């Protein structure tokens, strides 16, 4: 029997209400985290003898001593975790473990064309984390070449310390991936996504494109969007966002959606003709559902 302890907000077998998600933040602020987490777990759960347990984004959910005695490994799926506010407590937890630790799909949060010639605020924290993990495993999996280049500036080597593996969400369907080829017209069902990290022109462009398709939907992914949809609260952010209030037309027309689990999300996208926007996992979800997607890139 394989007993896997992993970093994540929920398991693929759990479903939480919108209210619970808002109060406990099991999505880690972004429901896109479900996607790569499900991809990792689907790859690991190869038989009925595999037991999985989430830490619900709480480093102290189980004490290190308990984890050492009751689990075979600690799996750490990550997104763009190498950033300025990188969490040091995860490093401390890993150092206390005696079981193997596996980092899968970690990425660097940076500008579109990052400058690696200058030190970054998170350098020391990232170096300590990667070193701690490598003491418990042979290698870590990173999302792309830019993350690899960043780790090289910290003294780590590709092939020895890390390997570029892409985003784990793309593993979810294995080789059985079929993308439909719809004929698009003004009546097509098109799903849009966007975020505040995208530039103002990008957000305006996405909003403009929505007007070209009457049967459009905007798919939210972050906690503030869920709070607006579920509670009617204004979207709280320091800069102007596309749909901040329930008085906006998209709310009034019932064209805004937020999905609290991956199956329902992909079911809705499978019934769509195209997904378009600046959210990586919002578009990957569409591809996994068999729907073509167009990603507007905003960073590395």
Mark where each language-model region is:
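Active-site anion-handling motifs in enzyme catalytic cores
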Residues: 1-300
């Amino acid at each position: 029997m394989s007993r896997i302890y992993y970093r994540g907000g929920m398991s693929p077998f759990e479903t939480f209400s919108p209210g619970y998600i808002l109060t406990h933040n099991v999505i880690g602020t972004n429901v896109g985290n479900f996607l790569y987490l499900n991809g990792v777990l689907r790859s690991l759960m190869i038989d009925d003898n595999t037991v999985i347990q989430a830490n619900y984004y709480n480093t102290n959910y189980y004490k290190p001593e308990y984890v050492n005695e009751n689990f075979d490994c600690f799996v750490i799926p990550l997104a763009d975790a190498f950033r300025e506010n990188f969490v040091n407590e995860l490093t401390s937890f890993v150092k206390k473990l005696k079981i193997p630790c596996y980092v899968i799909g970690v990425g660097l949060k940076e500008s579109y064309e990052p400058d690696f010639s200058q030190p970054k605020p998170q350098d020391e924290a990232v170096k300590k984390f990667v070193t701690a993990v490598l003491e418990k495993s042979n290698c870590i999996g990173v999302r792309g070449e830019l993350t690899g280049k960043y780790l090289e500036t910290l003294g780590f080597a590709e092939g020895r310390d890390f390997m570029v593996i892409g985003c784990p969400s793309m593993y979810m369907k294995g080789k059985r991936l079929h993308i439909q080829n719809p004929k698009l017209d003004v009546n097509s069902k098109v799903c849009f996504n966007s975020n505040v990290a995208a530039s103002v022109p990008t957000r305006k462009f996405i909003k403009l494109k929505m007007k070209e398709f009457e049967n459009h939907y905007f798919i939210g992914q972050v906690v503030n969007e869920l709070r607006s949809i579920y509670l009617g609260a204004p979207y709280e952010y320091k800069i102007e966002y596309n749909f901040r209030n329930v008085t906006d037309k998209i709310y009034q027309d019932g064209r805004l959606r937020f999905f609290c689990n991956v199956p329902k999300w992909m079911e809705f996208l499978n019934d769509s003709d195209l997904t378009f926007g600046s959210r990586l996992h919002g578009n990957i979800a569409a591809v996994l559902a068999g729907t073509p997607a167009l990603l507007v890139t905003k960073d590395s």
